Amino acid sequence: MNVRDVMKSFHIQDTLNKKVWEEDKTLNKNVRKILLKVSQKFIKDWNIDKKVKIQDIRFTGSLAAYNWSKYSDIDLHIIVQYKDLNKDLNLVARFFTLMKAYWNIKHDIKIDGYEIEVYVEDVSEKHTATGLYSVLEDKWIKEPEPTDAVFDEDDVMTKSKYFFNLYNDILLKKYKEGKYSEVIQVIEKTKEKIRKMRSSGLARGGEFSTENLVFKVLRRTDLLGKMNDLITKSTDKKLSETKKM
């Protein structure tokens, strides 16, 4: 997928997505029903003894705004209070990250071609989203407004190319040379760098910050997926070497 082709998807639409939203900008009843069922199933799969109060179930991301495209997915956030589960909030966050990954491996649920991405979020986490809808309450928390998509295309291109070059010229080379530990280490550091970069961009410049758009380019061109695959392959190679010893 060409980077410039992906960037064309960042333009603003005239309306919210009509497959998801009604004319009065409320969530389509069937869509809401599916999202509630998906949430209930996901929560059930946690399989934890302690009863967790669900604070809210929220729909956010580009499909809850005017910058949706064919690349969009449905970001479904289940809001809980982490400290209700454990005082170690980092432990709780890691648990839910693993649950999300496990869920995505097991399930491939889509609504009109749009994949549902389920997340668990602490109630204290701040939102920078353009649009935020409570699926539980069936109302907008923050209703989006159409706005001009102003961003520095050249800057997005330059920063995106850095990560493509890192993957093609360094990571693949190290993998072919059998430097599997280095591959894993570099990718883990790179993923953390991308995560921090996106968070700071959203906080400072919102949806159309260079950092957030770079993240979208990396995701929509599947570079992030390729990095994850390379971690898996490198880990398998390391384990195979251990067995031979």
Features from the language model and the residues they span:
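Catalytic core of pol beta-like nucleotidyltransferases
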Residues: 4-72, 80-245
